[in-house]
Amino acid sequence: MKATWDIFCSVVDNYGDIGVTWRLARQLVAEHGLAVRLWVDDLNAFTPMCPGADATAAQQWQHGVDVRHWPAAWLPVAPADVVIGAFACQLPAAYVEAMRARPQPPLWLNLEYLSAEDWVEGCHGLPSPQPNGLRKVFFFPGFTDKTGGLLREGSLLARRDGFQQSAEARRAFLQGLGVDLVPGALLISLFAYENPQLGNWLDALATADQPCHLLVPQGRVVAGLSQWLGEGPLHVGDVRTRGALTVQVLPFVSQDDFDRLLWSCDFNAVRGEDSFVRAQWAGQPMLWHIYVQDENAHWEKLEAFLAHYRCGLSDDADAALLGLWRAWNMDFDMGQAWRAARQHWPELQQHARLWGARQAAQPDLATALVHFYRNSL
């Protein structure tokens, strides 16, 4: 009999939380043959990344996953063999009580946010006894072999390589999004939160020697583009040109198409957790817009990742990359930082590829979770 898994997702950051849990659920079904229920409290955040999904359905099957609406008024269900609470979400009290009542309590995992901070290695896999007698285990994704690794489907990098080696596949995909490539242009994707340095970066792109084609999926940063252009709201399909820069607004796409978008671009600026990991697998230079926390607590998390990611760069390229990421996240001059990074482009390209290869040498997150469960039996 298949092991049953329940994954609970409370949507906080629009698409980041559901993005991670939806990828995980799909992979557990497709590659490990598990029976997975994904509980989501806001299906409106789920439907944009899963075409054909119904935001009003209490239950639906998508890609082999039993997707359930997590209602405010909980209805009794039998707990699964493995229960994952994503990102410290609080499970329904009645469900937890049903877990306790099982003859063999489920494996209860708290899937934490991704972090490169040193303390993660020491906390990964730690049990947390609960007052009701159950035991919850902290499971941390991460960038070292002492963590749970990163989400990565088994065929991902082979599919990426095949796509990137086919100019026709890239052209056809982009045309399907309504993108007619500007000849000789640097192709950039931008998926970000509001950012005070956006205008400085756009100015640098518009005045650069090489043309640039900026692809912007629907999202929070689009309003900043409209402001920079000095016009009303931009809509999907709109294309505007200023100087050397062409800006184009794209529709929100499925996760698989978002991967292809990242693979298609020469540079990817991303936000949150899911797109952050997928940009790393794209093997192209990238920039992460980290989620802002009170008292700039996110800066420590940013610097922890950079301490890993920068290893192996020359001193000059290292300084340029560090300057670019700090400018975008700490409100320094993004125009100057971008021009400095462009001076080291070949090295940054090679480094991005090598980083992905090093991460791929470690077990992926879904496999690590399955092994953890099997070892617990």
UniProtKB/Swiss-Prot annotation:
The active site is at D17, E273. Its EC number is 2.4.1.-. Changing R271A: Strongly reduced protein-arginine rhamnosyltransferase activity. It comes from the Bacteria. Changing F258A: Reduced protein-arginine rhamnosyltransferase activity. Changing Y193A: Reduced protein-arginine rhamnosyltransferase activity. Changing Q255A: Reduced protein-arginine rhamnosyltransferase activity. The keyword Flavoprotein does not apply. Changing Y291A: Strongly reduced protein-arginine rhamnosyltransferase activity. DTDP-beta-L-rhamnose binds at Y15, Y193, Q255, R271, G272, E273, D274, S275. One of its GO terms (molecular function) is protein-arginine rhamnosyltransferase activity. Belongs to the glycosyltransferase 104 family. This is Protein-arginine rhamnosyltransferase. It comes from Pseudomonas putida (strain ATCC 47054 / DSM 6125 / CFBP 8728 / NCIMB 11950 / KT2440).
